[in-house]
Amino acid sequence: MDGLGEKKPWGKLSRLLGAETESSSELFLYKKEWTIGRKKACDLSFPGNKLVSGEHCKITVNEESGSVSLEDTSTNGTVINKLKVVKKQTYPLKNGDVIYVVYRKNEPEQNVAYLYKSLNQAEDSMQNPADTSGSEEADTQTLSSQDDQLSYEEPQPSTSTSSLFSTPTTSASEPACTLLYKSQASVPGVQLESGEKSGESLEGHSSTSDATAHEKGSLGPPKKRMRTEDLWTGNKNLVSASCSKGASDESKTPSMKPDKMEETLTCIICQELLHDCVSLQPCMHTFCAACYSGWMERSSLCPTCRCPVERICKNHILNNLVEAYLIQHPEKCRSEEDRCSMDARNKITQDMLQPKVRRSFSDEEGSSEDLLELSDVDSESSDISQPYTVCRQCPGYVRHNIQPPPYPPPSDTEASRTQGDAPSTSTNFPTATQEYVCPSHGSHVICTCCFQPMPDRRAEREHNSHVAPQQCTICLEPFCHMYWGCNRMGCFGCLAPFCELNLGDKCLDGVLNNNNYESDILKNYLASRGLTWKDMLNESLSAAQRGVFMLPDYRINGTTVLCYFCGLRNFRILTYQYRQNIPASELPVTVTSRPNCYWGRNCRTQVKAHHAMKFNHICEQTRFKN
């Protein structure tokens, strides 16, 4: 703060409501522009607070006029006197304004608030001493932390007080009503409604000197006493209105922190209990349907983890938990008007894909989005109708979505197949797939692997064998790989005939009941004979066809269409039987000389290397078997 000696400060920020009471909680503003944010380069930096944006806001002063303004540049929003500042817009700062860098309704201990004080105005008020002032010390001494929270230089004194005392202060021993009265009675220079200057202010009540009070009289002149009572009556109504909001608020003053269940069931966007909640895939974070309806128009990222959202689903379990919680805590239920408003803003009436973002929304610094509903900032005119599911075969898909055609020119190169548009598993059905065009608002099904929609032609396949399979025979889950090729990164081919499934090079790792030692024995056996897992699969399928090997489902054979997971599960069943039928003469002596484990293949300790090396687990359980 070397600049303090060179340039006179024009304002001061005093920390409010925070747990820290350090000397650095008071900051003098002397530069023309003062920045606040999480970056270390900011003048007021919060490097460890993820609720603060990299460049949250900035305070500027007009050196000619002396006017001070605040511009919000954050993603979470800046709040002044409980009113959210519109992003990229400036807000004029007045003496006594409370600036919330972080505002959490249900977690006031996380609030980061500062009281702005204009030093020029403070000097003006100190240059006009009261007629009955006892000493100059009373005019020039620094206000206490509670007195600094109030300023009544605006025409309506209730503006700043109502915005400040609705949240708990650092003093938990006195109720809000008492603090309000004390502050109004002790702050010098309180402006009255009739516009009296410092000569008719309440300065007489702020003096603690008995001699000064004796000179003035116990209650001051009758006119002053009448104006004081009017001021107290007006603010008492404000306090009564705020206290009537909840019957149990007074009893909860010592511990404002919500219980764990309430924290779990709270939406981070509106900071209220979840209402008709939805979950995002793949991250599974949960929000109110109405809150996320407004969010998804501005960003395709999750407000919590910044993960790209692929799908939005109703969360019925959490909805039931919220309903049960509200039965036990009816005072925390939303008002009927609030619920109707949220239902009207809800655009997620069914499970759906994340729609295309219509306007950009800054995702700076990866900070957590904590939107506030303190003011009606978002325009209601941005509402759009419920989007319906479309796929690459829907009419007009290419026209509305600027993407390359879904089917590249026929090519036998591997590069064209890696894109997933011409998979080798669907070469028998290229014409029927490529020529199909979805009817208007036709039925679609979502691929379990890539979460992308495709036409639902499963019923049509029962009558037309040229339609590519779209679901697994065992689990009946839909997959798109055989229809037009799955485009998900890392997909080996999520749907294919059992004999053509690509299980990957690591499919033999822990393939025998997660026993790595037994699996390594099998891998060494195959390598010594120049065999691969594919050769073993074909040989095992032939044995299953002859009835030598058994599978849990009689329908499974080499041509059965299976998904990757069902195929891998049945591959492990066949692999165990293949290993069981290897003659002992073809295995090393160190393998065949081990005694059998009592628990056999059902042993839960075989995953430990020492136990797996000591006992053979390619056998059936012989002890404690029911």
UniProtKB/Swiss-Prot annotation:
GO cellular component labels: nucleus; PML body
Gene Ontology terms, MF aspect: nucleotide binding; ubiquitin-protein transferase activity; zinc ion binding
Pfam families to which the protein is assigned, alphabetical: FHA (PF00498), zf-CRD (PF17979), zf-RING_2 (PF13639)
Span of zinc fingers (PBZ-type): 595-617
Pathway listed: Protein modification; protein ubiquitination
Domain FHA: 34-85
Catalytic activity: S-ubiquitinyl-[E2 ubiquitin-conjugating enzyme]-L-cysteine + [acceptor protein]-L-lysine = [E2 ubiquitin-conjugating enzyme]-L-cysteine + N(6)-ubiquitinyl-[acceptor protein]-L-lysine
Amino acid composition bias (Low complexity), ranges on this chain: 158-170
EC numbers: 2.3.2.27
Keywords on record: Cell cycle, Cell division, Metal-binding, Mitosis, Nucleus, Transferase, Ubl conjugation pathway, Zinc, Zinc-finger
Acidic residues: bias regions: 363-381
Composition bias, Polar residues: 123-133, 140-149, 416-428
Name of the top EC class for this enzyme: transferase
Cited function: E3 ubiquitin-protein ligase that functions in the antephase checkpoint by actively delaying passage into mitosis in response to microtubule poisons. Acts in early prophase before chromosome condensation, when the centrosome move apart from each other along the periphery of the nucleus. Probably involved in signaling the presence of mitotic stress caused by microtubule poisons by mediating the 'Lys-48'-linked ubiquitination of target proteins, leading to their degradation by the proteasome.
Family: Belongs to the CHFR family.
Protein name: E3 ubiquitin-protein ligase CHFR
Annotated organism of origin: Xenopus tropicalis (Western clawed frog)
